[in-house]
Amino acid sequence: MITNTFIEKTKKKIARAEVVSFDIFDTLLLRPYLSPRDLFLHIEIDQCLEGFAFARREAELSARKKNPDKQEICYDDIYNEIEARFASAKKIELDWEFMVLQPNPEMKILWDYALELNKKVIVISDMYHSYEDLSQLLIKNKFHDFAHLYVSSRYGKTKKKGTLFEQVFHDLQVKPQDIVHIGDNKKGDFRTPAKLGMQAILYKQVTHQFLAINERARRFTEQNVSSLGKSILVAMLAMRWRKQTLQQERAQYWEDIGYAYAAPLAYGYSKWIETTAQQKQLDHLLFVARDGFLLQKAFEHFHCGEIKTSYVYAPRLLNLVYRLDYDKRNIEHVQTIVDFYSQKYADIRELRETQSLIKANDYHQFIQSHKHMFERYAKDMYADYHAYIDTIVDPQQNIGLIDSKTVAFTSQKMLEDVLQRPIQGLYWSTLLPYRTKKYAFDAFIPNNLNTLDPNVFTKNWKFVELLLSSPEFSIQGVSQEGRAIYKADPGTDEYVIKENYTQITKGAEIFYADLKAIFGQTPVYIEGQELVSWVNIFCDHPNSHDIKEMTKIKLAVDASHDRNMPLFSMQTSCLDFFKQPKVTLNALKNIAWRTPLQTLILHILRPIKVKRKPAKQLKISFFPYLKVQYFVWTFSLFKRLSCQLSLGDDKKHSS
């Protein structure tokens, strides 16, 4: 177990003290927000109280200005100043505090330690809430057996002024130096009590501790404007981090990935799915394997309505081989069909062995030459698939299909063909708009540019697909009984992913449990663009542990799942450079993450990249695989040739 130096040092001071005093907010109790004011924003959004967050802040300021003689105001003073239309929020806000406030496990250790030593434990808070409410909050969060609770709103005195501490000295007849006080406010919990002679311990808020050691979370909070979803997500990650640092066993890498990335993505996307499905009056949602696995789990965890869900198999491979729906010019399409049938049917395999098939047209002609055989087998398989879907879907239901990204709408096309009626597609986003006119669909993040925009699909869409996937091997078909027919000989890469995905699912389930424990069924409003930004920061800022773990991950890039490519990083050895120097270098150029040694080798062996463009343009890049572009110089040579010289990342846009 890693030693917590703060706890150990504080325990020593507690052991020598007569009285141990704790602050409440951000010390004993934690709010699941980066800022306490985000609680007001959450209430405003969830309760449809437009303008409440601002009005609540202004009411508190007004109450303090109107009571200059009071060191502290009370809760009633605030709501006496607020607009009448927000009067109902008085109870809502207090109920919300009871719902979301969580015990700080670090403080619970110190609290219990002080009680074990028979120290007098007291609580001192500068707060407008009442003594009764704060007492109940402490007891609800397992902070029992405190000897006294001092609340500024009750005494009209504060810690910041020192008067509330003086009240403690008087009541308990104790010397200041015999009291240890722990709190997070620099003035009220540290400077003032220290001046009075108390043993003051300044506690750094959990979110501040977390942001100090987690670069990605820090970048996320600093990026663009603050938002409710971002505030809640980072605060939850901070609270999980705090719990983990106090446990003897740390979570596995992929469990952490599931908690921090897979679960928030699935949650945010599934809440949009729920809202859209309700607007479209859909009765039954079909979550398409394998990208729908975690989405369905998230939906079922937090959906309170009566929309039915099913997990169905409808990958693009099945559309190719069951319906023979292919582009004859696409080598991947035609080769996948021929290879699939050759492996499954001996007569087609024998015919295939007599042919030399190289180009797309060769495969197409082979299919056409033996069309009757392909169509007969396809008809039988498609009949089984039809029977499988019929056991799931009621003819009277309004159907929604859930998938991640789509280009050709293959799953929707196949299911509409089976059901013989239109269905509603719900996607993260889509590509190629000319294909969308045939299908009814909505997108979580509309793709206005109709490209693989990193602000829509993230900087590595394969990573998102991995996060939303399932602990299954690739699917080669579906039996009439509805059982998935998996690939007969999955490779090592698929076994690694399946094993890791079990941990991803575990992390996601813990996130959902934490979310429910704090908020119940109250939505937390994590928006699509925030999720994209969060994933992109992961893609841009890996640490050495990320790079090491991701070297094991290769994902399929074809419909038949026969060709795999590294997701982020790869392992290389000196032998690789001697055996296959060109192949190894090309692979290094194309991966997103490299070790320092790999980067150095790439810079030494490929220091310059030259590109000749149409219209007499020449681009020369020095050290093009650096992560940063340091300069770009564009000039005209003899008024005939436009030249561009750059140092650093050649993929950056330049003028």
Indicate where each model-derived feature is located:
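Long, low-complexity, Lys/Arg-enriched
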Residues: E166-L172, V180-I182, R191, K195-S655
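N-terminal accessory alpha/beta regions
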Residues: A55-I78
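Active-site neighborhood of HAD-like aspartate-dependent phosphohydrolases
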Residues: I7-A55
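A short acidic, amphipathic alpha-helical/loop segment
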Residues: K9, E106-Y113, Q136-L137, T192, ...
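Nucleic acid-processing catalytic cores of prokaryotic defense/repair systems
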Residues: R31, L39-I43, W111, M127, ...
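Short, acidic loop-to-helix structural element flanking the phosphoryl-transfer center
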Residues: E72-V123
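Substrate-recognition "cap/lid" segment bordering the active-site pocket of phosphatases
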Residues: I122-I124, Y128-D178
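Short, surface-exposed acidic
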Residues: Q47-A59, E83-W96, K142-V151, P176-D178, ...
